[in-house]
């Protein structure tokens, strides 16, 4: 067996593995939705590609992953350029510095961590220059942890009221990172806060 054949076999096995993993995750989502009385079609699976090579992402695309999330803008930008021949929809899920908005505006389809009017203004300006618009989620710090980005819950309503002025930002909803804890009640509390905030908007 030559090296090229070995690489092809490895890629085929990776494709099978990714398809199997996707099926397992989707089944877990279906089971959880059934238990909660929720429609599985209302849940969106977004694979996060942090530290994963572009070659493996190409295989993941073949397995059915057509949307991918990245938390670092530089890594996302590099991957989007290498994989420009594939119509991947890129979601930036991490904190964005104002000076990096120009990069996001060139390729991303979605930004899930908006928590600053300064960033909103810069991103809107850059998107207008590119002739593009993207979907945006407002990040909320529902756990109150200082190590996390996001707006405090009490600031969300006022923040959202300022967003219609940014015509290139399509506000789709809220995003949070719940507290990382084995205490399910503490985790659930974060999502209850989010539901309450959503009800006020």
Segments and roles (model prediction):
Residues 2-201:
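Conserved alpha/beta-domain cores
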């Amino acid at each position: 067996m030559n090296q090229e054949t070995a690489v092809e076999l490895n890629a085929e096995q990776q494709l099978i593995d990714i398809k199997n993993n996707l099926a397992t995750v989707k089944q877990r989502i279906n089971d959880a939705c059934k238990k909660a009385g929720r429609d599985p079609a209302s849940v969106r699976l977004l694979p996060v590609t942090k530290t994963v090579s572009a070659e493996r992402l190409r295989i993941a695309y073949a397995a059915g992953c057509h949307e991918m999330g990245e938390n670092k803008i530089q890594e996302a930008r590099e991957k989007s350029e290498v994989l420009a021949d594939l119509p991947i929809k890129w979601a930036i899920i991490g904190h964005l510095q104002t000076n990096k908005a120009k990069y996001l505006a060139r390729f991303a389809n979605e930004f899930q961590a908006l928590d600053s009017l300064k960033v909103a203004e810069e991103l809107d300006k850059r998107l207008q220059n590119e002739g593009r618009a993207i979907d945006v989620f407002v990040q909320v710090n529902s756990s109150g942890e200082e190590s996390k980005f996001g707006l405090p819950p009490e600031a969300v309503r006022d923040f959202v009221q300022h967003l219609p002025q940014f015509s290139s930002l399509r506000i789709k909803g809220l995003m949070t990172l719940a507290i990382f804890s084995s205490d399910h009640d503490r985790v659930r509390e974060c999502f209850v806060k989010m539901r309450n905030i959503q009800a006020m908007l």
